UniProtKB/Swiss-Prot annotation:
GO biological process entries: translation
Disulphide linkage map: none
Keywords: Ribonucleoprotein, Ribosomal protein, RNA-binding, rRNA-binding
Subunit structure: Part of the 50S ribosomal subunit.
Protein's gene: rplV
Role: This protein binds specifically to 23S rRNA; its binding is stimulated by other ribosomal proteins, e.g. L4, L17, and L20. It is important during the early stages of 50S assembly. It makes multiple contacts with different domains of the 23S rRNA in the assembled 50S subunit and ribosome. The globular domain of the protein is located near the polypeptide exit tunnel on the outside of the subunit, while an extended beta-hairpin is found that lines the wall of the exit tunnel in the center of the 70S ribosome.
Family, similarity comment: Belongs to the universal ribosomal protein uL22 family.
GO molecular function annotations of the record: rRNA binding; structural constituent of ribosome
Protein name: Large ribosomal subunit protein uL22
GO cellular component, one term: cytosolic large ribosomal subunit
A Pfam family reported for this protein in Swiss-Prot or TrEMBL: Ribosomal_L22
Length: 114
């Protein structure tokens, strides 16, 4: 049986747009977990808080479920897929209305051993 060397965590239907979340994920992809957490702490962004929480969950999964060492972990894979969109309308002049799309995101973070 092959030894498991990676762990995954997901945050689903998060109220941040996928485009903004991908900007944050690009900062941490390929970094070791200590550096990634430090980067996220100093990123002034709503998406950074969500990604940080998901990363900590992935680290906890690696330690508790698979017995991996935190010091050896690297952020191997990160992606933000589009979740369901909430559609709203903004009233405009002359009785018309404009659509507003409130986008949501499914964030996935995978950590693996070096």
């Amino acid at each position: 049986m092959a030894e498991i060397t990676s762990a995954k965590a997901m945050a689903r239907t998060v109220r941040v747009s996928p485009r903004k979340t991908r900007l944050v994920l690009d900062l941490i992809r390929g970094k070791n977990v200590a550096d990634a957490i430090a980067i996220l702490k100093f990123t002034p962004n709503k998406a950074a808080r969500i990604v940080e929480k998901t990363l900590n969950s992935a680290i906890a999964n690696a330690e508790n479920n698979f017995g991996l060492e935190k010091a050896n972990l690297v952020v191997s894979e990160t992606f933000a897929n589009e979740g369901p969109t909430m559609k709203r309308f903004r009233p405009r002049a002359k009785g018309s209305a404009s659509p507003i799309n409130k986008r949501t995101t499914h964030v996935t973070v995978v950590v693996s051993e070096k």
